[in-house]
UniProtKB/Swiss-Prot annotation:
The lineage of its organism: Eukaryota, Viridiplantae, Streptophyta, Embryophyta, Tracheophyta. The keyword Cell membrane does not apply. It comes from Arabidopsis thaliana (Mouse-ear cress). It catalyses: Release of an unsubstituted, C-terminal glutamyl residue, typically from Ac-Asp-Glu or folylpoly-gamma-glutamates. This is Probable glutamate carboxypeptidase AMP1. Zn(2+) 1 binds at H356, D366, D432.
Length: 705
């Protein structure tokens, strides 16, 4: 039963009376009382003993970090996750409101300033799904499309925003469903026109792109399976096939309650949805279909990857598939929870930590491993506040809704606040699946690389005694990825608003992704039995927030960014083989490099100045430099956006409109190359990126021409 969004009653403090040379029994009782008091304090920061006098100096900064790290509690995080995963909580459903209340009440119980930002969005749910196979001997087979018992509260596997309808035809196996896979089929005389295609999900294409390409090739319907088999349980991977992100009936503006909504037949809306039905399948069912296929043998490269056998045929075969999806699209209320921890000196500058709350099923990994870490960070921040700390800059803790449908909650919030974000957001720190296995992974915009590595040096590795996360990261992975992908809530912040961003997670992948088996039970038996990885992630995430909020000078390194731009330019030049000049890029990057070094020198000088509030001149210089450091990323935005995906404005990191792009950066240039555009068009895209880099240089340098 849902609880009202009210503040929980606070509890009075506990005092411990000191004593000398107690007898053994008293000593034992004292230890017990101390343990209980410590446990109580961690869970009820209102009861912390009188606050420390907090002043901003190196010693107190160190004490603050130590207090934050030492107040970690794996048992507490475990209890949060257990509560969050008691029931499925798909966005727009009643159980999702229970999860909303739990998160909201948790924040309020800590005494944190908390509010709900409500929106209205078009969501998609299944009403009927079926897949049957007919054979030439009149045998019929109906596939089981559920990965849980019939009376389970978990939503049946489906693709959100698939159109309702049926498709009947022979089956053709299309590998990962990429353009090159269809080219391979064409080379052996196989067409998918009038057929149902079977695709295995790969790394390069999302579900929506797989369906879009199949539709363009003349397929009637699409079945998609994942080779991980749901951890051996027969799990089926749910997901969305909507194109783009955000509420489809309020494209480009916030979906506020009572605001403008387009009709479902508006062209701006219909182009977001596929025109042919699609459904997810289990690996078990996919293998039945694969075994029935005749026709030509699959290309060698298909048979050398994944679980495709050496004798695999691509079809068509003697099996005819009849697939049906019936669904309904409904306007639903979605709710973001936002905590505000006001800054003491630069309250108008914001460091944002975010995680989504909604899940396809129970969501133990995706996303509530991240949610439980965020709840623990809030508990520890409340403890710091009781000790006398206040951040220099304002910190926001955000719990997003409806991410699984296409990052809807965060996108609507960004669209409503885009001007304020552009003027005052320092950074966005995203954690979606905090823990899905072993090993630390991260993606970031390059100016945050150095800060991230510094923080990793402060956190103990959960899997290697005596080592820091930085030491194991350096030996096992040591790659900070770039954020051109669109698969979590950082996308709108970086690609649309130009906010420096980080995305982090433990574990490269996990087998129960988006299945009914993503549960608390799976977490404690597989990914993190003792919740030590959760503790490490919460430590990294929270310390990043503290340092970005507290450091007098924002810890951004644009020399690192310049080096990365140069590496991107070199790779592009090699790809173009001299056919198109990259000189505009070279000149722009050279200028950016010089300005980055000047800014680094300026920061070095200012670090030697007094941090006293009374030193007005030094404070003004720091503020002016901080503003320039903060605004650089906005320079990479272009009002026209990426051709074909105009909502995405970032010209250095953003999603390429063409899935076959050979670059993970410069999306406009990458698309032009992938589409075999003329040299003039490619050159124009190069100039667009060069101008964006020049804008970033101007922002970092300050002043006017």
């Amino acid at each position: 039963m849902s609880q009202p969004l009210t503040t929980r009653p606070t509890v009075t403090g506990i005092s411990i009376i000191p004593f000398r040379q107690p007898p053994p029994l008293c000593s034992f009782l004292f230890v017990i009382v101390l343990f209980v008091a410590t446990f109580y304090t961690l869970h009820h920061p209102d009861a912390v003993t009188p606050p420390l006098l907090f002043s901003r100096n190196a010693y107190n900064a160190l004490r603050l970090r130590r207090l934050f790290l030492s107040s970690a509690s794996n048992a507490t995080i475990s209890s949060y996750l257990r509560e969050l995963t008691r029931h499925p909580h798909l966005a727009g459903t009643k159980p999702s409101l229970d999860t909303l209340h739990y998160v909201f009440n948790h924040f309020q119980s800590l005494g944190l300033e908390t509010h709900v930002a409500e929106y209205e969005a078009l969501l998609s749910y299944p009403t009927h799904i079926s897949v049957t196979a007919s054979f030439s001997n009149t045998t019929t087979l109906e596939f089981d499309l559920n990965d849980v018992p019939g009376d389970s509260p978990v939503v049946r596997p489906y693709h959100a925003y698939s159109p309702s309808g049926s498709a009947q035809g022979n089956v053709v196996f299309v590998n990962h469903g990429e353009e090159r896979d269809y080219h391979a089929l064409e080379s052996i005389g196989v067409s998918v026109k009038g057929c149902v295609v079977l695709a295995r999900k790969g790394e390069n294409l999302g579900r929506g792109a797989i369906v879009k390409i199949a539709e363009a090739k003349g397929a009637l319907g699409v079945l998609i399976y994942a080779e991980n088999d749901g951890g051996g349980f027969g799990g089926i991977e749910r997901g969305t096939v909507m194109r783009g992100i955000g509420d489809p009936v309020s494209p480009g503006w916030p979906g506020v309650v009572g605001g403008e909504k387009l009709s479902l037949d508006d062209e701006l809306v219909t182009r977001r949805f596929p025109k042919i039905p699609s459904l997810p399948l289990s690996l078990r069912n996919a293998e039945i279909i694969l075994a029935s296929l005749g026709g030509a043998r699959a290309p060698l490269e298909w048979r050398n990857s994944g679980r495709v056998g050496p004798g695999q045929r691509v079809g068509p075969g003697r099996m005819v598939i009849n697939m049906t999806f019936q669904g309904e699209m409904k306007m639903k209320k979605i709710n973001n929870v936002v905590v505000t921890i006001r800054g003491s000196e630069e309250a108008d500058r914001y460091v944002i930590l975010g995680n989504h709350r909604d899940a396809w099923t129970y969501g133990a990994v995706d996303p509530n491993s991240g949610t439980s870490a965020l709840l623990d960070i809030s508990r520890r921040f409340a403890l710091l506040l009781k000790s006398g700390w206040r951040p220099r800059r304002t910190i926001l803790l955000c719990s997003w809704d409806a991410e699984e449908f296409g990052m809807i909650g965060s996108t609507e919030w960004i669209e409503e606040n885009v001007l304020n974000l552009g003027a005052s957001a320092v950074a966005y720190l995203n954690v979606d699946c905090a823990v899905q296995g072993s090993g630390f992974f991260a993606g970031a915009t390059p100016q945050l690389d150095g800060l991230l590595v510094d923080v990793l040096k402060l956190v103990q590795d959960p899997d290697a005694v005596g080592l820091t996360v930085e030491e194991t990261f350096k030996s096992q992975n040591n790659i900070i990825q770039r954020l051109s992908r669109v698969d979590s809530d950082f996308s709108g912040f970086l690609h649309h608003a130009g906010i420096p961003s980080i995305d982090m997670y433990y574990g490269a992948d996990y087998p129960v992704y988006h299945t009914a088996f993503d549960s608390y039970d799976w977490m404690i038996h597989n990914a993190d039995p003792l919740f030590h990885r959760h503790v490490a992630m919460a430590g990294i995430w929270g310390l990043l927030g503290i340092l970005l909020a507290d450091e007098p000078l924002i810890p951004f390194d644009y020399i690192s960014y310049a080096d990365q731009l140069q590496a991107h330019r070199d790779k592009l030049s090699k790809l173009l083989e001299g056919k198109v000049s990259v000189n505009p890029l070279s000149m722009a990057i050279q200028e950016f490099s010089l300005v980055a070094k000047e800014a680094a020198d300026e920061a070095k000088k200012l670090k030697g100045k007094s941090y006293s509030k009374n030193d007005v001149a030094a404070a003004a210089k720091r503020r002016e430099l901080n503003d320039r450091l903060m605004l650089v990323e906005r320079g990479f935005l272009d009002a026209e956006g990426i051709k074909g995906k105009e909502w995405f404005k970032h010209l250095v990191y953003g999603p390429a409109a063409e899935p076959e792009s050979k670059l993970g950066f410069f999306p406009g240039i990458a698309d032009a190359i992938a589409m075999n555009a003329s040299e003039g068009i490619i050159e124009h895209e190069i100039w667009r990126v060069a101008r964006a880099i020049q804008r970033a240089s101007k922002a970092l340098k300050g002043g006017f021409t």
